[in-house]
């Protein structure tokens, strides 16, 4: 039996619901849950045994802003590689927590490679394939005992595609006895939730503290994910990892992830997220990190980099210059953020506007910390710049982009300079 958790009362103003109160889970130098900011994580797609390739991708993901990185640990070679990957990253000054993703044979790999068990910051366990039949409880117990021995947290991650079939069959049989049976989808959602919750309670019985457990119950459908997490959040106080199990490729994957996760986050549900995008050909793996950050920032959860507002363009904006400038500005502030984070803390909260005509340009620019209203079709060839709501200067000529970038840099230095002491 799982304790019910009272759902927060929704706010009357334009803010998100209060965050759900959960256990706080320490993962390396990162804390998940317990009211801490929602954590961005990602996963490599390299062969973990390829140490050089894995180190490079983890470093790339970390530089992009991933606060934890998960790697596949599926054989002896990948398990043996983990300590060496950690060592090489630390030599580069990168101390990002690494999560081992285990399926089927994790109990064997951790027992055979104690250095791997020690080097990882967290273990991911799938209750649907940790063992089958009589071996399930034994092998799950071995993984939990390893987590206890090395003082490591775990994520117990149930998955729609690898659901515990014995539990699903049991719940289907129980459902058939109901006076009013549930539909099959509801039974399977319940099986997914029960798989995660029952496994978590079993881990606690074995001696793993509740503050060492994170749960997830992933599906690929937006409405199903929302329903699963709302239900699971009401039945426990474990920290929750959000994400579609396979979001998809391109805009579909981004939209599906945003549609599902933003609803849950606005209701105070979720302590760490991963956007499981299928990379497009030639696209960097870091794209999923950027999308995760932008989702958290646009929903008001966290700030990572100055946000640029830009109009979509219409018949009044036949020039493409405002589009080009918006891209230049976004790339500039993203490139500067690693430096600003140290020298100008708070710059990530800055808002910028790059507008293309007089209709909304001045108004949007006044709402931003710094905004520029470029001339539309038939308008005078001048671009007023607004700083903190006041018209500051009018830019003209061939160097508008460089001058506007300079004004942004000056504003950051003036407004967010780190104070001595």
Curated annotation (Swiss-Prot):
InterPro entries: Dihydropteroate_synth-like_sf, IspG_bac, IspG_bac-typ, NO2/SO3_Rdtase_4Fe4S_sf. It comes from Xanthomonas oryzae pv. oryzae (strain KACC10331 / KXO85). It catalyses: (2E)-4-hydroxy-3-methylbut-2-enyl diphosphate + oxidized [flavodoxin] + H2O + 2 H(+) = 2-C-methyl-D-erythritol 2,4-cyclic diphosphate + reduced [flavodoxin]. Belongs to the IspG family. Its EC number is 1.17.7.3. It is an enzyme of class 1 (oxidoreductase). Keywords: 4Fe-4S, Iron, Iron-sulfur, Isoprene biosynthesis, Metal-binding, Oxidoreductase. [4Fe-4S] cluster binds at residues 311, 314, 357, 364. GO terms for biological process: isopentenyl diphosphate biosynthetic process, methylerythritol 4-phosphate pathway; terpenoid biosynthetic process. This is 4-hydroxy-3-methylbut-2-en-1-yl diphosphate synthase (flavodoxin). Its cofactor is [4Fe-4S] cluster. Pathway: Isoprenoid biosynthesis; isopentenyl diphosphate biosynthesis via DXP pathway; isopentenyl diphosphate from 1-deoxy-D-xylulose 5-phosphate: step 5/6. The keyword Iron applies. One of its GO terms (molecular function) is iron ion binding. Binds 1 [4Fe-4S] cluster.
């Amino acid at each position: 039996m799982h304790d019910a958790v009272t759902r927060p009362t929704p706010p009357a103003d334009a803010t998100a619901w209060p965050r759900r109160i959960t256990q706080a889970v320490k993962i390396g130098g990162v804390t998940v849950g317990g009211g801490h900011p929602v954590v961005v994580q990602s996963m490599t797609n390299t062969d973990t045994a390829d140490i050089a390739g894995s180190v490079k991708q983890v470093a790339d993901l970390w530089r992009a802003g991933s606060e934890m990185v998960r790697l596949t640990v599926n054989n002896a070679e990948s398990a043996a590689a983990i300590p060496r990957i950690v060592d090489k990253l630390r030599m580069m000054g990168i101390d990002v927590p690494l999560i081992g993703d285990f399926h089927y044979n994790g109990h064997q790999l951790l027992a055979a490679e104690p250095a791997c068990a020690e080097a990882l910051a967290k273990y991911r366990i799938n209750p649907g394939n940790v063992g089958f039949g009589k071996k399930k409880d034994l092998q799950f117990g071995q993984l939990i005992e390893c987590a206890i021995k090395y003082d490591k947290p775990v994520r117990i991650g149930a998955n729609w595609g690898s659901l515990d079939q014995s539990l699903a069959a049991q719940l289907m049989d129980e459902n058939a006895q109901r006076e009013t049976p549930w539909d099959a989808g509801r039974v399977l959602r319940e099986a997914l939730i029960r798989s995660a919750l029952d496994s978590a309670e079993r881990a606690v019985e074995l001696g793993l503290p509740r503050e060492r457990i994170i749960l997830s119950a992933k599906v690929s459908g937006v409405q199903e994910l929302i329903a699963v997490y709302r239900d699971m959040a009401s039945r426990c106080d474990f920290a929750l990892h959000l994400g579609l199990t396979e979001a998809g490729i391109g805009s579909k994957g981004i939209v599906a992830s945003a549609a599902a996760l933003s609803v849950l986050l606005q209701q105070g549900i979720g302590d760490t997220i991963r956007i499981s995008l299928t990379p497009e050909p030639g696209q960097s793996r870091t794209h999923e990190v950027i999308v995760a950050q932008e989702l958290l920032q646009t929903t008001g959860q966290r700030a990572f980099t100055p946000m640029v507002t830009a109009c979509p363009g219409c018949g009044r904006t036949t020039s493409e210059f405002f589009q080009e400038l918006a891209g230049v500005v976004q790339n500039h502030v993203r490139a500067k953020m690693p430096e600003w984070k140290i020298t100008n803390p708070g710059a990530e909260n800055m808002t910028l506007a790059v507008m293309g005509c007089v209709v909304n340009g001045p108004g949007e620019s006044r709402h931003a910390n710094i905004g520029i209203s470029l001339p539309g079709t038939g308008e005078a060839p001048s671009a007023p710049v607004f700083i903190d709501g006041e018209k500051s200067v009018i830019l003209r000529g061939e160097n508008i982009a460089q001058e506007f970038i300079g004004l942004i840099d000056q504003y950051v230095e003036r407004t967010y300079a780190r104070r001595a002491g």
